C-alpha cells in the first residue's frame, strides 16, 4: 500500500484545512496517509501577536521523514509570490536526501493559498514544484478532470499546477467547498499515481 505524506506550513489555518482535504482524497484512493507540518520560525511572542493559529494538531516533520513515503504533497501559503520561508528553510535542509537520491521516483505535488486571485498562486506552486523536480520526483498537478477549477460563477482557486485557495486580504475567507474538493481530487490523483508506481 502506498504511503503518502502531506507536508504543510500554515500560519492562519487555511493551508491546514487544505492539507486535511488532500489527505482525505489520498485515503479515498487507498493510501496510508500522514499529515505533518514544518517547524515555525517566527518567535512565539510575534506569532501570538500576529494571531497565528498555534493549536495545529499535526506533528512536526523531520527531513529524514521524507524518505519514508512514496508520495509527498507540499502545501504552504504564499509570501510575495513564493513559498513561505518556513517551508523553504525545511526543504533547503534536504541536501543529504538529494545527494543520495533518496527521493528519486517518488510522486510529488503542491498546493497553496493567496490573499487575492492574482496574489502569486502559480508562482508559489512553481517554487515548490522546482524543488520536487530537483529531488527527482514525479510531479502530479490538479488536472482538468477537476473541471471546477474553470468556474466563473464564483471566486475560486485552483490551477493545473495544484490546488489553491483564496483567503481574502484579512484572512477571513476560509477554503470553499469547491477549493476543498480540488484539494481532495489532487490528493486522490497523487495517491493513485503512487499506487501505480510503487504498489
Swiss-Prot record:
<dbReference type="InterPro" id="IPR005025">
    <property type="entry name" value="FMN_Rdtase-like_dom"/>
</dbReference>
<feature type="binding site">
    <location>
        <position position="134"/>
    </location>
    <ligand>
        <name>FMN</name>
    </ligand>
</feature>
<comment type="similarity">
    <text>Belongs to the WrbA family.</text>
</comment>
<feature type="binding site">
    <location>
        <position position="98"/>
    </location>
    <ligand>
        <name>substrate</name>
    </ligand>
</feature>
<dbReference type="InterPro" id="IPR010089">
    <property type="entry name" value="Flavoprotein_WrbA-like"/>
</dbReference>
<dbReference type="Pfam" id="PF03358">
    <property type="entry name" value="FMN_red"/>
</dbReference>
<keyword id="KW-0285">Flavoprotein</keyword>
<dbReference type="GO" id="GO:0050661">
    <property type="term" value="F:NADP binding"/>
</dbReference>
<feature type="binding site">
    <location>
        <begin position="113"/>
        <end position="119"/>
    </location>
    <ligand>
        <name>FMN</name>
    </ligand>
</feature>
<dbReference type="GO" id="GO:0051287">
    <property type="term" value="F:NAD binding"/>
</dbReference>
<feature type="binding site">
    <location>
        <begin position="10"/>
        <end position="15"/>
    </location>
    <ligand>
        <name>FMN</name>
    </ligand>
</feature>
<dbReference type="GO" id="GO:0010181">
    <property type="term" value="F:FMN binding"/>
</dbReference>
<dbReference type="InterPro" id="IPR029039">
    <property type="entry name" value="Flavoprotein-like_sf"/>
</dbReference>
<dbReference type="GO" id="GO:0050660">
    <property type="term" value="F:flavin adenine dinucleotide binding"/>
</dbReference>
<dbReference type="GO" id="GO:0008753">
    <property type="term" value="F:NADPH dehydrogenase (quinone) activity"/>
</dbReference>
<keyword id="KW-0288">FMN</keyword>
<dbReference type="InterPro" id="IPR037513">
    <property type="entry name" value="NQO"/>
</dbReference>
<keyword id="KW-0560">Oxidoreductase</keyword>
<protein>
    <recommendedName>
        <fullName>NAD(P)H dehydrogenase (quinone)</fullName>
        <ecNumber>1.6.5.2</ecNumber>
    </recommendedName>
</protein>
<dbReference type="InterPro" id="IPR008254">
    <property type="entry name" value="Flavodoxin/NO_synth"/>
</dbReference>
<feature type="binding site">
    <location>
        <begin position="78"/>
        <end position="80"/>
    </location>
    <ligand>
        <name>FMN</name>
    </ligand>
</feature>
<keyword id="KW-0521">NADP</keyword>
<dbReference type="GO" id="GO:0016020">
    <property type="term" value="C:membrane"/>
</dbReference>
<keyword id="KW-0520">NAD</keyword>
<feature type="domain" description="Flavodoxin-like">
    <location>
        <begin position="4"/>
        <end position="190"/>
    </location>
</feature>
<dbReference type="GO" id="GO:0050136">
    <property type="term" value="F:NADH:ubiquinone reductase (non-electrogenic) activity"/>
</dbReference>
<feature type="binding site">
    <location>
        <position position="12"/>
    </location>
    <ligand>
        <name>NAD(+)</name>
    </ligand>
</feature>
<keyword id="KW-0547">Nucleotide-binding</keyword>
